[in-house]
Structure formats: C-alpha cells, structure tokens
Amino acid sequence: MTAIVDIIGREILDSRGNPTVEVDVVLEDGSVGRAAVPSGASTGAHEAVELRDGDKARYLGKGVQKAVEAVNGELFDALGGMDAEQQVQIDQTMIELDGTPNKGRIGANAILGVSLAAAKAAAASYDMPLYRYVGGTSARTLPVPMMNIVNGGVHADNPIDFQEFMIMPVGAPTFADALRCGSEIFHTLKGELKKAGHNTNVGDEGGFAPNLPSADAALDFVMAAIGKAGYKAGGDVMLALDCAATEFFKDGSYVYGGENKTRSRSEQAKYLADLVARYPIVSIEDGMSEDDMDGWKELTDLIGSKCQLVGDDLFVTNVTRLADGIKNGRANSILIKVNQIGTLTETLAAVEMAHKAGYTAVMSHRSGETEDSTIADLAVATNCGQIKTGSLARADRTAKYNQLLRIEQELGAHAHYAGKAALKALR
C-alpha cells in the first residue's frame, strides 16, 4: 500500500523569485506527499550543496533543471517500489547514490525534496498529520517563535551589521497568544519607525530594514515597541539576535562596516556579553564566525551559562560538526535547517544528538522560502520548543505560523506551549 509508484519533480519559484525544487511522491494507495525546498542567503561554507544549473541565459544561472532531472530520473529509478515508511532506507539510498560527502552530485535540493515528500506521503497514507507520523504520540509541544522583526546584514540594505533582531514571546500561555503578542509588537514597531521617519518596507523574512546606525539603536526601537504594545520586555517578551558573524569576519577580526569599527575575537565576545547585560537577550545565533573555534569557546565560557548560543553556520545541522562542538564546549544550541544537511533522517539525528547532550535545538526556515509548512510540523514532532520562521508579514512566513495554530487547535487540551521552559536561562 505504501510502495512508491511515482516521483515527480518540478521547478517552482521561492519567495525571492528564484527557482527551487518541488517534489511529489505518489504511493500505491494513491496517497501523495508534496514538499518544496527552501534556499538560504547567508549560507555556511560547510552546508550540503544546493545544485544550480549555472546557465546564465536562464534564471541568471539559478535554474534547478538538473536537480529536477535527477528527481525524475536517477532518484525515481533507485526508489521506485520502495516502501515510503522506510525513511532511513530511502534517505540512505539517496546518500549512497549521490556518493559525495556534501550531496554535490545530485544536489541536496533534489534529495531533500524527495526525502520530505516521501515522509508526507507515508503520513497521508495513514491519514495522520506529519507531526504525529514523525513524532509519535509524545509530539505535543508548540514552539516559542523567534520573530525576526528588524533585519540587517545580508538580509537588508542598511548599515546594521547584525542580520536579525528577534522577539520571543515566552510569557504567553499558548502559541496563539504568543503569535498575537508578536503581531501587536510588529505593528507597533512599524508605527514607531514611521513616526521617526524610517522606511517600513520589509526584507526577505518580513522584518523591517530601517536605516539605523547600530545594534543598540535597533534594540532600543524593539524595546520601545514591546512596551508601547502593552508587554513587558524581560518578562512577557525576551530578545534574540542572529549576528551572522561569518559574514563580517575578515582576516581574523570582526569588521563592522556599518559602525566603522573592528573588533578582535575577545572584543567581539565582550561586546556580545555587554549587550546581554544591558538588554533582555536570551539567545544569540552565530555570534562568532563558523571557523573561529577559539572565539566560540571564549564566547561560550563567557556567557554560555546565561544565554543560549546557537550554532548555525558553525554546525550546519551536521552531526559530525555538532559532536565536535559538544566535545569542545562550543555553543549550547543548534539551529536546525533541513536543507543544510539534505535529508529528514539526518535532520532528526542532529536534533536527537543535541537533546542528548543537553543542547537546545531551534527549528528554522531559510530566507528563500515557499508556502511549504513542513518545518512547523517538524518543530512539534521533535518537541524542540523553539522555531525561527521570520516575521509577521509575507505569506511564506505566516504559512508556518498558521500551520502551528492548526496543530495547537487539533491537539486541544494535549497541546503544551513551551514558553520559558524552552530556554535554559529562564527555567
């Protein structure tokens, strides 16, 4: 009944208007699973490879026809007739077929599309929601959203060097209340920025990209919006940063082009510690560059006991890199991006390894997204307690939030909003 009878790949557009891969997996009983693959802007050097065509005459070289051909040809030939319930076997077959350490031959975008679509098809065959199929009966934790309401770095055309300034409504009793809190702060911030003469257009992830001179200026605006919306910063709502420090790490130093400042490794760690002391910041992602291992250790030793330090470019959802980080005391949390590693099996393995080591895990979108809401289900399936999926604008972002609302309603009295328990510093 759950044998794979067809795999159909196609080229669609992501939220930036660039091509990406979408896959349908069709089973013997007629069940269909569909998955669309996201794409990042600030990508780690150690990520699995997203295969692009490179033909400048078509989509400026960003086409994905080669990946789609692999889905319809090589991958279907290898997986046709296989049982969609055998997720590990499906993913392992594709990894072995690709034959490279980074999925660079077939493309992680092709492999991931098939991996996720197969899981969704199997769930559909059982008439089960994906979160229940993947997570079992214990999947009931609704994640705290990290809402990216001010953008800088490569996500915006402004002087702010840090990539994301986020709010976390940890004090809400339910996910629905957390979402309402975030929305009210988002709209209040828009009014405050407008009043101060700033542009209120939104960036790739739906956050505002005002022309502000520094991280402090951005944080001050966010703090003011939280208060004006009727919430308490440091109680109802905490702050989070994504520094994306790899993007401004040059020749061993952190070069803040917007602020016209250069900081050494130690100065970078102390600067972040100072921000944590002055603002209710409970999570910092990529505070150090992906290959600045000494910097990561220094930062973790300095503030790891009071702040979640999330490795994104550092770990790239890769268990080998995560194991090394755990062993050497770098960071205390991992960002989980399905397309960084390229299969559902490897994604779940990274979450499991993190949890066993006492690290937290944050399920995450990419800046180039689609209407696909798979990561919402995966956040609940893994009980990871945190999700990062952009701001309160753009349908590619709200699709994930809306799916979480549906899941919370479906779970009813069994639903549990992670709240402050999601963060070790607040327990």
UniProtKB/Swiss-Prot annotation:
Pathway: Carbohydrate degradation; glycolysis; pyruvate from D-glyceraldehyde 3-phosphate: step 4/5. It holds the Pfam family Enolase_C. Binds a second Mg(2+) ion via substrate during catalysis. It is found in: Cytoplasm; Secreted; Cell surface. (2R)-2-phosphoglycerate binds at residues 163, 337, 366-367, 388. Its EC number is 4.2.1.11. One of its GO terms (molecular function) is magnesium ion binding. One of its GO terms (cellular component) is cell surface. Keywords: Cytoplasm, Glycolysis, Lyase, Magnesium, Metal-binding, Secreted. It comes from the Bacteria. Mg(2+) binds at residues 242, 285, 312. Catalyzes the reversible conversion of 2-phosphoglycerate (2-PG) into phosphoenolpyruvate (PEP). It is essential for the degradation of carbohydrates via glycolysis. This is Enolase. It comes from Rhodopseudomonas palustris (strain ATCC BAA-98 / CGA009).
